[in-house]
């Protein structure tokens, strides 16, 4: 007998499956997700925990007329399997394959593109309001989970949704875990769930009693207020009810039959509703369920039988790990240094700091804006905070960087992990914009280390600097250099790492870890008789104009390289310096290499670098073209 899953090419097919067979279908979906994630990596735990929610939603609602909006998108693997992408699912997160997150261009069933947390409620509210304006039929459901309720924007959406009173359904997928364990008083309050029959019976009895008691006599009003106060102490939904939502739950998020029945009732409910579903992250796969740290979040390749990662050949440590070790050294030597992250203890490596310095390491939840202003407050009182955060997520706190940190010249260090191209996570997670959006902030020092030692030196430098500073480093392994003791670098001073005797044909100025590719390109060019010097600028801001402009003028041709967006980035900073010093008018030939004006899709990092033209071959080709073009025009 074949799989039920193989008979489903659309949500319409799913509706034909009897409710009694849905548990078997859920098991098949889990097996498919596990097998695929083992080969491709991905967000295993969240997707396994939300299988029944996915199946029940598609069994009751009619996508794409009814809009299903997934917060973050980690929970949506089953959604992809049920919406005509079963065969293509094996390609998820691979070059040319399905994206790891919902994307509007990929399917009409992906109502909203996601990747960053806490956005679903606001987007869903916009959709239901648009339906009201246009008269278009259909329901809208926002599925919120994976810690997204620790993000302030989720409550901003809830606040307006309750005020407007539209027929919006919010499903709170409560698995007690974000990427790191949920933190904060609000999360702790959520965790005090009452799923027992005793609690639910008591809740029904209180509700029935309150409805039966008439208003009027003072004594009865006192009773009503007293019982309502008691209810407020023990009902998990009181916060949502206070925001204008009808609260339902908690319910078992793995009882697919019960969920179908509940969704059928809620589909005809008038007004905003929040359904509180209790799930287990990694449900049905013991290694993911038992992983208390991440429960299968963002896994690479793993062995299905054990859940253990498939070991790669030994290589250099990841920049994330090197940063974490360097930070722990700084915290060991300076008690003023503290570490802050936004729900990414494992991802940023700060779990090491948390283990060694639990009272000086803060996980603030998915609250990047708060993280930055919290750091600013600490810095005001003499503390040296280090905010470790993915480059793509720091975008969410841009106003706080400018207004709360830079404007006040506070000594906050921003450690930007995943700077540049990130590989399989794709468009929503590329760290493409940080150099551009940080270098325009007055007084902010911006550094890009080219190897592990440079990272150590730059972290140490930032902690001695009496002002704000940022260092950004890529995803993946370092260069494998022998480590040196950390030392203070002179701010705004780069280094000439490859010189040539006499007059060079071209100068390559390579920011950050593009230096390795630039040096390889220079070696290849040397074999062809083209002499190239190579500069490591170290600082994107303040730029070492003396060194860069001197080497550019010496060669009369310069190629800038960065793993960041070309618009407003490092190459633009160099152009501004060349203009200030009259080099452009003097005939300097310039080529800028970096990420073009587009969102780069998912693939291996090496392939992405080749796509955008910043690998060694592309750098060498740009140098050849510049040298050849200049010589062809008779320019020395």
From Swiss-Prot:
Binding site for Mg(2+): 146, 175
Gene Ontology biological process terms from the UniProt entry: 1-deoxy-D-xylulose 5-phosphate biosynthetic process; isopentenyl diphosphate biosynthetic process, methylerythritol 4-phosphate pathway; terpenoid biosynthetic process; thiamine biosynthetic process
Co-factor binding comment: Binds 1 Mg(2+) ion per subunit.
Gene3D superfamilies xrefs: 3.40.50.920, 3.40.50.970
Keyword Ribosomal protein in record: no
Binding site for thiamine diphosphate: 74, 115-117, 147-148, 175, 285, 368
Superkingdom per UniProt: Bacteria
Xref: SUPFAM superfamilies: Thiamin diphosphate-binding fold (THDP-binding), TK C-terminal domain-like
Keyword Ribosomal protein part of the UniProt annotation: no
Cofactor(s) in the UniProt record: Mg(2+); thiamine diphosphate
InterPro entries, per database record: Dxylulose-5-P_synthase, THDP-binding, Transketo_C/PFOR_II, Transketolase-like_Pyr-bd, Transketolase_C, Transketolase_CS
Molecular function GO terms recorded: 1-deoxy-D-xylulose-5-phosphate synthase activity; magnesium ion binding; thiamine pyrophosphate binding
EC number: 2.2.1.7
A GO CC annotation given for this chain: cytosol
Pfam families tied to this protein: DXP_synthase_N (PF13292), Transket_pyr (PF02779), Transketolase_C (PF02780)
Principal EC category: transferase
Pathway(s) the chain acts in: Metabolic intermediate biosynthesis; 1-deoxy-D-xylulose 5-phosphate biosynthesis; 1-deoxy-D-xylulose 5-phosphate from D-glyceraldehyde 3-phosphate and pyruvate: step 1/1
Keywords from the named record: Isoprene biosynthesis, Magnesium, Metal-binding, Thiamine biosynthesis, Thiamine pyrophosphate, Transferase
Catalytic activity: D-glyceraldehyde 3-phosphate + pyruvate + H(+) = 1-deoxy-D-xylulose 5-phosphate + CO2
Matches recorded under PANTHER family: 1-D-DEOXYXYLULOSE 5-PHOSPHATE SYNTHASE-RELATED, 1-DEOXY-D-XYLULOSE-5-PHOSPHATE SYNTHASE, CHLOROPLASTIC
HAMAP family attached to this UniProt entry: DXP_synth (MF_00315)
Subunit structure: Homodimer.
Function noted in UniProt: Catalyzes the acyloin condensation reaction between C atoms 2 and 3 of pyruvate and glyceraldehyde 3-phosphate to yield 1-deoxy-D-xylulose-5-phosphate (DXP).
Family statement: Belongs to the transketolase family. DXPS subfamily.
Protein name: 1-deoxy-D-xylulose-5-phosphate synthase
Organism: Anaeromyxobacter sp. (strain K)
Organism taxonomic ancestry: Bacteria, Pseudomonadati, Myxococcota, Myxococcia, Myxococcales
């Amino acid at each position: 007998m074949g799989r039920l899953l193989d008979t489903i090419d659309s949500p319409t097919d799913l509706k034909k499956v009897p409710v009694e067979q849905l548990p078997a279908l859920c098991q098949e979906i889990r097996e498919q997700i596990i097998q695929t994630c083992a080969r491709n990596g991905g967000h295993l735990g969240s997707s396994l925990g939300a299988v029944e929610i996915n199946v029940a939603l598609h069994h009751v609602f009619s996508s794409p007329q009814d809009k299903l909006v997934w917060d973050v998108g980690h929970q949506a693997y089953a959604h992809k399997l049920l919406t005509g992408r079963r065969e293509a699912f094996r390609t998820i997160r691979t070059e040319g394959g399905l994206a790891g997150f919902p994307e509007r261009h990929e399917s009409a069933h992906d109502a909203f593109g996601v990747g960053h947390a806490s956005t679903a409620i606001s987007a869903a509210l916009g959709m239901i309001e648009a339906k009201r304006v246009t008269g278009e039929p259909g329901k809208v459901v926002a599925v919120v989970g994976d810690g997204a309720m620790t993000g302030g924007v989720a409550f901003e959406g809830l606040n307006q949704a309750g005020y407007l009173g539209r027929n919006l359904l919010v499903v709170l997928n409560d698995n007690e875990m974000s990427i790191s364990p949920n933190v904060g008083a609000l999360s702790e309050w959520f965790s005090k769930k009452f799923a027992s029959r005793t609690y639910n019976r008591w809740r029904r009895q209180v509700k029935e009693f309150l409805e039966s008691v008439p208003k009027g006599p003072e004594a009865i009003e006192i009773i009503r207020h007293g019982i309502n106060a008691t209810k407020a102490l023990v009902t998990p939904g009181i916060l949502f009810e206070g925001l204008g939502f009808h609260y339902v739950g908690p319910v078992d998020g793995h009882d697919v039959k019960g969920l179908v029945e509940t969704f059928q009732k809620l589909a005809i409910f008038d007004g905003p509703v929040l359904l509180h579903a209790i799930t287990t992250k990694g449900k049905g796969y013991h290694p993911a369920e038992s992983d208390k740290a991440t429960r299968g979040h963002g896994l690479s390749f793993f062995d299905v039988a054990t859940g253990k990662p498939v070991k790669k050949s030994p290589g250099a440590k990841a920049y994330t790990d090197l940063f974490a070790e360097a930070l722990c050294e700084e915290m060991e030597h300076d008690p003023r240094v503290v570490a802050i992250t936004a729900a990414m203890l494992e991802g940023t490596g700060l779990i090491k700091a948390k283990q060694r310095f639990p009272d000086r390491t803060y996980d603030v939840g998915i609250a990047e804006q708060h993280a930055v202003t919290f750091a600013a407050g600490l810095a005001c009182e003499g503390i040296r905070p280090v905010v470790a955060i993915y480059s793509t997520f720091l975008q969410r706190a841009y106003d706080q960087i400018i207004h709360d940190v830079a404007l006040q010249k506070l000594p906050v260090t921003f450690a930007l992990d995943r700077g540049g191209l990130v590989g399989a996570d794709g468009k929503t997670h590329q760290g493409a914009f940080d150099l551009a959006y940080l270098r325009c902030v007055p007084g902010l020092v911006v550094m890009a280390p080219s190897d592990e030692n440079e990272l150590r030196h730059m972290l140490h430098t930032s902690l001695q600097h009496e002002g704000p500073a940022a260092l950004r480093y890529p995803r993946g392994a370092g260069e494998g250099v022998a480590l040196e003791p950390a030392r203070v670098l002179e701010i705004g001073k780069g280094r000439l790492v490859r010189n040539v005797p006499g007059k060079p044909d071209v100068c390559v100025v390579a920011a950050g870890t593009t230096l390795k590719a630039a040096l390889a390109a220079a070696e290849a060019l040397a074999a062809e008789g083209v002499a190239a010097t190579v500069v490591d600028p170290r600082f994107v801001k303040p730029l070492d104009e003396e060194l860069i402009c001197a080497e550019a003028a010496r060669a009369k041709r310069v190629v800038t390289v960065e793993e960041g967006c070309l618009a407003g980035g490092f190459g633009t900073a160099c152009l501004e310096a060349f203009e200030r010093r009259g080099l452009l008018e003097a005939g300097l030939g310039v080529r800028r290499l970096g990420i073009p004006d587009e969102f780069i899709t998912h693939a291996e990092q090496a392939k992405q670098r080749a796509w955008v033209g910043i690998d060694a071959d592309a750098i060498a080709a740009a140098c050849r073209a510049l040298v050849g073009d200049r010589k062809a025009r008779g320019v020395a």
